[in-house]
């Protein structure tokens, strides 16, 4: 495969955040930069879109096709691995998920890669031994910069081994609270869970509100972001949702208006029914509220979808 020349797009003082910046200046510097930046950042959740709407059928060929445009786009991160994608890479596509990350990383040197990890279930469907968890995290941490970690019951001890290894690797740790709408899922419940996470991790983390069910109203999400922000004002909140009910753009807007600094969306040419909402719709609506996407190159986002559309 022909190697393309790496092109460093980052310049000192720009709002975008690069892997080099994280390596050279550390996680705390990155978190402080996010807090100082007006507006909000966008994560492109291609992995979740691929899993939710295409059964992880998006191939490395397609990812390489738009690598240059995505690298130019200025996303906070690109979720490109994790969840069910690792086993699909190995068992169905018959590719090495680590080699995929290495090749894509060479073509996207200015973009942080993100993964979704299921705590002690890692990228699988059952609990794994402690040594397997730690070895796996160390191995993937060579290529992955942002680690979103969750336990679907919000049982914090199930995430601790991953927390420890991500921190030790110098990567950005993003513990999650999984959102639901039962009578017990109050603001007080979630604020308490955030406290349990911080007791383990300290405050040098991102916190994800993980609304993978696409539940709740925009007001409900806004109230939750505000409750967490009021209790922990220095915490950087990252909202993740699905557009299954068609309402997630409203929830994203409410999250940003109430203090979230990073939100998830996907390339508009690939969005469908169950994944995150279309990126440009999110950006345009928030712009009408006076919030700009930090570091985002709109033309690169458009060119990405122009290339992706025939691949759908």
Regions found by a protein language model. Give the residues of each.
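Catalytic cores and adjacent flexible loops of soluble metabolic enzymes
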Residues: 1-148, 152-312
């Amino acid at each position: 495969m022909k190697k393309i020349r790496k092109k460093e797009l980052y310049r000192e003082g720009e709002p975008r955040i690069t892997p080099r910046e994280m390596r050279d200046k550390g996680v705390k510097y990155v978190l402080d930069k996010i807090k100082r930046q007006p507006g909000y950042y966008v994560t492109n959740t291609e992995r979740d879109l691929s899993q939710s709407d295409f059964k992880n059928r998006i191939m490395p060929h397609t990812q390489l096709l738009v690598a240059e445009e995505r690298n130019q786009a200025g996303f906070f991160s690109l979720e490109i691995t994790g969840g069910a994608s690792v086993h699909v890479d190995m068992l169905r596509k018959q590719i090495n998920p680590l080699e995929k990350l290495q090749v894509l990383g060479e073509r996207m040197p200015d973009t942080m890669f993100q993964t979704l990890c299921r705590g002690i279930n890692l990228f699988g469907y059952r609990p794994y031994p402690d040594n397997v968890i730690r070895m796996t995290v160390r191995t993937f941490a060579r290529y992955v910069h942002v680690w979103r970690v969750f336990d679907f019951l919000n049982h914090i001890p199930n995430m601790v081994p991953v927390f420890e290894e991500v921190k030790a690797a110098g990567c950005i740790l993003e513990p999650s609270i999984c959102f639901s709408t039962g009578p017990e899922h109050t603001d007080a419940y979630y604020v308490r869970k955030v406290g349990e996470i911080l007791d383990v991790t300290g405050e040098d983390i991102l916190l994800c509100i993980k609304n993978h069910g696409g539940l709740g109203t925009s007001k409900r999400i806004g109230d939750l972001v505000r409750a967490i922000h009021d209790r922990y004002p220095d915490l950087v909140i990252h909202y993740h949702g699905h557009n299954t009910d068609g309402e997630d753009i409203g929830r994203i807007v409410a999250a940003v208006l109430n203090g979230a600094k990073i939100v998830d969306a996907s390339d508009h040419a690939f969005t469908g029914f169950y994944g995150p909402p279309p990126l440009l719709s999110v950006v345009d609506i928030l712009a009408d509220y006076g919030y700009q996407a930090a570091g985002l190159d709109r033309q690169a986002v458009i060119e990405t979808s122009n290339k992706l559309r025939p691949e759908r």
